[in-house]
């Protein structure tokens, strides 16, 4: 009903476009074109009241043109630019925008994706990354109702693919495409506090953007699909994950509880990770 929809808030999308330095080989424009075309046809976008497209790096005019032209200037889309964001911040500016949105809209449900692989131009990595992106988009975008149901009706706080539970390091959704609620986001630290850590760890500990979603002390997670595949090395083909029925014969996702005792220091060896 309308009252129930108002009580749940809106569905809002966040899309991070990370543009590498101009002297770095990249096919980011191809990635943006492919992802925007898929977004616009997806269940996730049809459910959304708005989509925030946040661009980090140079060439904002090119990114803006691609998004505007492909969407035919859809008023649902808002464009943002972080021109001076250093490369080590990666997705943090867009996640901060998501965090700020939730401060004003605590009932909203969110989905998030980014230009995974934009800095990996050379084969075979660029080829395997394209397959990885497509796999994540299949669940998070094309069949977005699965995660939307898990968040809005299933009692889950986060929903995604390939949950990685590292005792020493951190827990995260591999690839960092996900759905979540503003109620969960409001329990996390502001992403901007990760900037000094990201700068210090740029070449050692990987991408802090992936770890942020799991920095609440406890939550319930829904994992739609998992594989032990090495996405950087091996292509994950559609026949390995697509459901011929479009998930019409599958029950809705369920959650498992998760807890962490050192949410603000996920690099600490005292972290025990998450588990059912």
Where are these regions (language model features)?
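ER/Golgi luminal nucleotide-sugar-dependent glycosyltransferases, focusing on the catalytic module
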Residues: 1-276
């Amino acid at each position: 009903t309308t009252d129930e929809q108002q009580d749940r808030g809106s569905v809002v999308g966040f899309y991070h476009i990370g543009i590498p330095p101009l002297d770095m080989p990249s096919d980011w424009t191809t990635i943006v074109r492919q992802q925007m075309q898929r977004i616009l046809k997806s269940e996730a976008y049809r459910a959304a009241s708005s989509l925030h497209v946040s661009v980090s790096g140079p060439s904002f005019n090119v990114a803006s043109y691609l998004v505007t032209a492909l969407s035919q200037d859809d008023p649902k889309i808002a464009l943002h630019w972080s021109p001076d964001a250093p490369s080590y911040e990666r997705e943090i500016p867009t996640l901060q925008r998501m965090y700020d949105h939730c401060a004003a809209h605590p009932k909203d449900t969110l989905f998030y994706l980014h230009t995974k692989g934009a800095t990996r131009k050379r084969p075979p990595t660029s080829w395997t990354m394209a397959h990885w992106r497509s796999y994540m988009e299949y669940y998070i975008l094309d069949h977005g109702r699965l995660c939307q149901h898990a968040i809005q009706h299933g009692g889950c706080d986060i929903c995604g693919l390939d949950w990685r539970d590292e005792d020493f390091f951190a827990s995260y959704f591999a690839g960092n495409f996900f759905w979540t609620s503003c109620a969960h986001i409001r329990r996390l630290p502001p992403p901007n506090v990760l900037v000094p850590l990201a700068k210090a760890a740029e070449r050692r500990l990987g991408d802090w953007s992936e770890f942020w979603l799991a920095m609440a002390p406890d939550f319930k997670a829904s994992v739609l699909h998992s594989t032990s595949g090495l996405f950087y090395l091996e292509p994950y083909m559609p026949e390995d994950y697509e459901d011929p029925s479009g998930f019409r014969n599958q029950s809705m996702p369920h959650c498992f509880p998760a807890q962490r005792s050192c949410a603000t220091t996920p690099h600490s060896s005292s972290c025990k990770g998450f588990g059912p």
